[in-house]
Curated annotation (Swiss-Prot):
The species this protein was found in: Desulfotalea psychrophila (strain LSv54 / DSM 12343)
Membrane topology: Multi-pass membrane protein
Entry's Gene Ontology cellular component terms: plasma membrane
InterPro entries according to UniProt: DUF2179, DUF5698, N-reg_PII/ATP_PRibTrfase_C, UPF0316
Disulphide-bridged cysteine pairs: none
Alphabetical list of Pfam families matching this protein: DUF2179, DUF5698
Keywords of the record: Cell membrane, Membrane, Transmembrane, Transmembrane helix
Stretches that traverse the bilayer: 15-33, 45-65, 72-92
Compartments where found: Cell membrane
Protein name (database record): UPF0316 protein DP2912
Amino acid sequence: MIMDFVSFFEPASLLYAAMVFLSRVVDVSFGTLRTISIVHGRTTMAFWLGFFEAAIWLVVVSTIVQTVTEQPLLVIVYALGFATGNIVGIKFERMIALGHLVLRVISRHNSNEIAYEIREQGYAVTAFKGEGRSGIVTELYIVCRRRDMKRILKKVMALDPKAFYVSERAGEVSNVYRPIMQPMTGWRRVLKKKYHSPSSALQGFSGEGSSPSSLSQLGRAERHFPGTVLRCRPYVPFLVISFASEMRPPDTARAFSFGQRCGLARLTPPCISQRALHGTSLSGEALVSG
């Protein structure tokens, strides 16, 4: 027994134990993700996770059975890998945050401001009036992606630190409104382009590559969206005007009408008419003929 204990700490044995441990961690992590994928109805992901889980498990178990009598401490390594794999799988699933959830926010104060701010970020909010122990309260009903919950709650708590909220997993969802402009993080922030203001963009044009009619269209855009034109790029014989506006109704209807007259080349979000009806932010690019 003592000889088995000593031989376990030899370099070759330690490397073998590390491989068993890591393989078991990966195996169980795949199993955890597979179970969650089945619950969410993601059949393709569940299929491939189950395939690799079974393959890794078969290799590890067949190897352990052959050597466990010679190195009994591998049982502990195997068990530690199993336990660690559960934690790693749960942590990884929380990080990727698959699926959607229903978020209910109950507030006594600033409920209108909370609903407005959340809608301005691109989410749909339904408000209900109710009565609590201390008086009238408002319940805000929000369906969003799980990865967006922290962003929404941060805005809620900034407006009402005493707000009560509860979340639950959503099954099938017919339509989910997503944030219009995602904050750039990591490598995306490094690659982020610097936008120029309308005045600096106009100063950069010498008339070459853009016709007077294109510049007049840019002037129209500035009049319709004061302070919201982000940049303009000359593409002979076109001029692309990028704009982003956070307006309340009925300004969104006017913005949609202007976008139709200019001929929108790309819309963010795709369904701009629904966004206009909900009074949320509007962004896009107008491709204007020169």
